[in-house]
Amino acid sequence: VEAGAVLGDLCRDAEAGWYSPQTRQWLQTVSGESLEASGLQEDTQGTHPLAQQVVMLRHSRRFGEGSGIGQLARWVNQQQPAQARKLLAARSHDDVFCLSLKNEQDRALERLLLEGHGEGPQGYRYYLSLLRNQRPPLDCPLEDPRWTDWARQVLQAFDAFQLLCAVRKGPWGVEGLNQRVTDALLKARLIDSDQQWYEGRPVLMTRNDYGLGLMNGDIGIALKLPEREGPEAGKLVLRVAFPRNDGQGGVRFVLPSRLNDVETVYAMTVHKSQGSEFAHTALILPDALNPVLTKELIYTGITRAKDWFTLIEPRAGVFEEAVRRRVKRLSGLMLELKEGID
């Protein structure tokens, strides 16, 4: 919920509870659970009427009890930076990693982004290797289902890893890191060009295109496919593969010339990643505190990770400062409701 949004303002007392004795009694009766040891605040003065209509779900089933990702997310959400740091430093969970960079040119960053962590958490080499190794024979016509199957596998492999940034500008922002990853992939010969369009380029839709049926936030990958007809029939040309999101695993292919509102997406902002999840997610923080750095942003970045999470820190202390800060939400609706009640 964004800062100033209505839902966040209406539910701002949900964490503390503030149930009246009557509400508490009703909850205990219908649930069979005692609230005595819940730690929830009690509204004995009738000053929180809206809280009687709000319930907060407190148990996440997304991460298991022993999940380092789940525990780290809880410490961040509770604004406990010391506990979060202790978990990161202990290295006792095989799903949470931390990389402290020595300086801006530290090549450990490139190694992580390309290779990941050993056998499990992947980097960008994974999807590009699959792209090359699983490509159908070049004499297969475009109608052959092997092309669609291959494109689907590449798209799924790309979801194995995503780099998230807090900011857009600077060496630790989306723009600088997209260029840095592109340079590293070119040097490793995992891509064959750094021009605007090349095979393997992942792109993010930045605006809805109803004519193409593509929405803001959709991710596609440029692939070489055989031309179907005309003087260049059979020749490999670039098309961008997008998942159809139809529940059937379908893939649509779009010519790059038809895509006007796209950007390279080796790195994306945490804001753009909301609603998505990736097997291995890496969150890189800037080297100085920034107004957007809050516990909400850190929490969102952590919870985009399905199986593994890596925190990348160019400078010590920024993570702790961010966790101590929270978004101030104020839509004005609560003030109006309070005046109406009074």
Describe the residue ranges of each PLM region.
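Short hydrophobic-aromatic micro-motifs
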Residues: 163, 204-205, 283, 311
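Short glycine-/acidic-enriched loop or helix-start segments at secondary-structure transitions
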Residues: 2, 175, 214-215, 293, ...
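Flexible, glycine/threonine-enriched loop-and-boundary segments that flank and lead into catalytic domains
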Residues: 206-219, 223
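A general structural-boundary detector
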Residues: 44, 60, 187-190, 207, ...
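Conserved helicase motor core of P-loop NTPases
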Residues: 1-203, 209-212
